[in-house]
Amino acid sequence: PYKAVCTHGWVVDGEGKTMHKSLGNGIEPKEIYDKNGADILRLWVASSDYHSDIRISKPILAQLSEAYKKIRNTARYILGNLSNQGGFDLDKDGVAYESMEELDKWAIMRLDNLIDKVNEAYNAFDFHIVFHAIHNFCVVDMSNFYLDIIKDRLYCEKPDSAIRRSTQTAMYRILSAISRLVAPILSFTADEIWSYMNHCASENPESVFLNCLLYTSD
């Protein structure tokens, strides 16, 4: 028994041709997760628009592996800056939204937009929109803009300065949200990120899956 079901088109090769053993154009799932890991296989499924035929090839998987690295590297950078110089405890060091720096408020605003878009996409079973939204957020909003601008705060300000704590508060909320939002797709990666976080009292540190997955900022 199930409440909903998705159907999809044929899985075809990179050129759109039907896979046949005689053509040698098939790819075994085991070959993918042995080489790239299970999360890359899950990401391929999620990134595909299942309303039409779904293409798979080694170049497509290579592109997805690079996209995956962007998301993972964003999480790793944030984790590093929440754990260095004595670490960051949201319950003790967190800054209230109204007292945060304007740039950090902007980051939270962009995060809220992402949460709304991803929640809407999950509810509509548009998993490819989930992937593209999270990837664009990590690359465009975070890596190319926000995380680049805040480097001086993180590396030059005193560890417990108000401006640095403001940034760390935003980073914590971003990391917590991203972990939850990607968990249905990048399950192993999300749980690994979660295991390294110094969690606030309202979160269950045991597993990301023991928390509300479709996270809201309220």
Predicted features and spans:
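Short alpha-helical scaffolding segments that buttress acidic/His motifs in well-ordered protein cores
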Residues: 5-6, 40-47, 75-78, 134-138, ...
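Short helix-adjacent coil turns
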Residues: 122-129
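Hydrophobic, well-ordered secondary-structure elements that form the walls
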Residues: 5, 16, 71, 142, ...
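Core structural elements
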Residues: 67-76, 105-113, 132-152
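Beta-strand segments within the central parallel beta-sheet cores of soluble alpha/beta enzyme folds
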Residues: 3-7, 207-210
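Acidic, turn-prone loop/beta-hairpin segments
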Residues: 85-116, 148-217
